[in-house]
Design a protein with these regions (language model features):
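Active-site flanking loop/helix segments enriched in acidic
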Residues: 7-24
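A charged, amphipathic interaction segment
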Residues: 72-158
Length: 161
């Protein structure tokens, strides 16, 4: 599922995605966004599932922050900030995937969000963009019932930068 695919080490070791809390958040966001994007195409049929996916993601974020020792007083504010960031990224990635601009908008969104703390993804950016497009196409072929059952097939992770 989306909760595991972000752990593929190739993203961190070969592509330079920061292997820290921010980088992990960005990779989770990329993959959860694709699942939610696909569920939106189902209309209201799987609206409850889409909400559950979102809720589980942020419940897990809350739990992870607590395990890292973030105080109870700070958790709400941190999760709210993460949710706001998530929505901004969803809009940017949707726009990038839908744009007919030879990938420019998606590349900019990836450089800004995924590689924002490292000064850009360089050669990795177009490869990760191609991976996202491949995942988006694969998920488009899934039925709503397959998604509801958690049967997701992801594109192979990029293997070389």
């Amino acid at each position: 599922a989306a909760s595991d695919v972000y752990k593929r080490q190739v993203f961190y070791q070969s592509y330079g995605v920061p292997d820290d809390l921010d980088g992990r958040f960005e990779m989770i966001t990329l993959h959860e966004h694709l699942v939610l994007r696909r569920l939106r195409r189902e209309g209201t049929r799987h609206a409850d599932l889409a909400q559950a996916v979102f809720d589980v993601m942020f419940t897990d974020m809350d739990r992870s922050l607590r395990l890292m020792g973030v105080s109870d007083i700070s958790i709400g504010k941190r999760v709210k900030t993460m949710a706001k960031a998530f929505y901004g990224r969803v809009a940017a990635y949707d726009g990038g995937l839908d744009a007919e601009d030879n990938g420019a908008a998606l590349h900019q969104a990836l450089d800004r969000n995924l590689f924002g703390t490292t000064g850009g993804g360089g050669a990795a950016t177009p490869l990760i963009a191609a991976y996202l497009r491949a995942c988006d196409r694969l998920l488009a072929d899934h039925s709503g019932d397959e998604l509801a059952a958690g049967r997701l097939v992801w594109a192979p992770a990029p293997t070389a930068a």
